[in-house]
Amino acid sequence: MKNKVVVVTGVPGVGGTTVTQKAMDILSEEGLTYKMVNFGSAMFDVANEEGIASDRDQMRKLDPETQKRIQKMAGRKIAEMAKESPVAVDTHSTVKTPKGYLPGLPAWVLTELNPDIVIVVETDGDEILMRRLSDESRKRDLETTASIEEHQFMNRAAAMSYGVLTGATVKIVKNKNGLVDNAVEELISVLR
């Protein structure tokens, strides 16, 4: 039997991973344990097992056909995990590149993954900008509030298209500054 597959997305700096991890901890205490998987890590595991990448930086240098094959295999691997327990997939709905927005879950991944719910974690663009500026542990491209808002709009559009293709519901969870517990509770209500 397939358990729930939930995809959690958000722009860098929105706090999606933090909100998801806190929700997972609370649900685990209640006896509902999700397997949390980062899609990029799942891709790297596949590439590493095949001997074609020994570190994550090599992943970007693989040819597009190899990338697609690895994405598909990672999606299949995560879907297999859902036979054992519910799965929460931490990934990006879209990736901003110099040539435009790249779908984080192209059709060949969605077919394998077949999510039940797509969650988009958001907040105001200025809050994200301030979080990014204060996070010295990461090297992120400098963006404006308007470009962050555009990225969030593209994430919503992509999430809805994922829902159209799979029948998944789409939920927007707001992670406002100082109100992370509210975002966690909202996420938990969807994951139960």
Curated annotation (Swiss-Prot):
**Top-tier EC class:** transferase
Which UniProt key words apply to this protein?
ATP-binding, Cytoplasm, Kinase, Nucleotide-binding, Transferase
Disulfide partners: none
Q: Which InterPro entries does this chain map to?
A: Adenylate_kinase_AdkA (IPR023477), P-loop_NTPase (IPR027417)
Q: Check the record and name the Gene3D superfamilies matching this protein.
A: P-loop containing nucleotide triphosphate hydrolases (3.40.50.300)
Protein source organism: Methanococcus maripaludis (strain C5 / ATCC BAA-1333)
Taxonomically, which superkingdom? Answer: Archaea
Q: Which gene encodes it?
A: adkA
Tell me the compartments it is located in: Cytoplasm
Q: Which Pfam family, an example, fits this chain?
A: AAA_17
The identity of this protein, by name, is: Adenylate kinase
Residues engaged in binding ATP: G10, V11, P12, G13, V14, G15, G16, T17, T18
GO CC field: cytoplasm
Q: Which family does it belong to?
A: Belongs to the archaeal adenylate kinase family.
- EC number annotated for this UniProt entry: 2.7.4.3
The UniProt entry, under HAMAP family, shows: Adenylate_kinase_AdkA
Catalytic activity entry: AMP + ATP = 2 ADP
One Gene Ontology term of the molecular function aspect: adenylate kinase activity
Q: How does it assemble?
A: Monomer.
